[in-house]
UniProtKB/Swiss-Prot annotation:
<dbReference type="GO" id="GO:0009536">
    <property type="term" value="C:plastid"/>
</dbReference>
<dbReference type="GO" id="GO:0003735">
    <property type="term" value="F:structural constituent of ribosome"/>
</dbReference>
<keyword id="KW-0694">RNA-binding</keyword>
<dbReference type="InterPro" id="IPR002222">
    <property type="entry name" value="Ribosomal_uS19"/>
</dbReference>
<keyword id="KW-0699">rRNA-binding</keyword>
<comment type="function">
    <text>Protein S19 forms a complex with S13 that binds strongly to the 16S ribosomal RNA.</text>
</comment>
<dbReference type="InterPro" id="IPR005732">
    <property type="entry name" value="Ribosomal_uS19_bac-type"/>
</dbReference>
<keyword id="KW-0689">Ribosomal protein</keyword>
<protein>
    <recommendedName>
        <fullName>Small ribosomal subunit protein uS19c</fullName>
    </recommendedName>
</protein>
<dbReference type="GO" id="GO:0019843">
    <property type="term" value="F:rRNA binding"/>
</dbReference>
<keyword id="KW-0934">Plastid</keyword>
<dbReference type="GO" id="GO:0000028">
    <property type="term" value="P:ribosomal small subunit assembly"/>
</dbReference>
<comment type="similarity">
    <text>Belongs to the universal ribosomal protein uS19 family.</text>
</comment>
<dbReference type="InterPro" id="IPR023575">
    <property type="entry name" value="Ribosomal_uS19_SF"/>
</dbReference>
<dbReference type="InterPro" id="IPR020934">
    <property type="entry name" value="Ribosomal_uS19_CS"/>
</dbReference>
<dbReference type="Pfam" id="PF00203">
    <property type="entry name" value="Ribosomal_S19"/>
</dbReference>
<keyword id="KW-0687">Ribonucleoprotein</keyword>
């Protein structure tokens, strides 16, 4: 289901990613697709596939659903892991 605002824009999908998904759809197979393309837009042919998206350190697998259509792949993978402030750091206090 594509929402109307996304139809007005030209959607960017990396060519290698689109080719891999088309090949898997033709074979009717489900495999994990590894990609570094966080800027690619999710399109309806991706629904039901597992795409492993790079977060800068590792690839995190994401299952694509119909609610994700129109969003970018990078929106669903966090790049920063906040570990909290240091508890016993008295040097920064006065």
């Amino acid at each position: 289901m594509i929402h109307s605002p996304t139809l007005k824009k030209n959607l960017f999908v990396a060519n290698h990613l689109r080719a891999k998904i088309n090949k898997l759809n033709n074979k009717k197979k489900k495999e994990i697709i590894v990609t570094w393309s966080r800027a690619s837009t999710i399109i309806p042919i991706m629904i039901g596939h597992m795409i492993s998206i790079h977060n800068g350190k590792e690839h995190l697998p994401i299952y694509i659903t119909d609610h994700m259509v129109g969003h970018k792949l990078g929106e669903f993978v966090p790049t920063l892991n906040f570990r909290g402030h240091a508890k016993s750091d008295n040097r920064s206090r006065r």
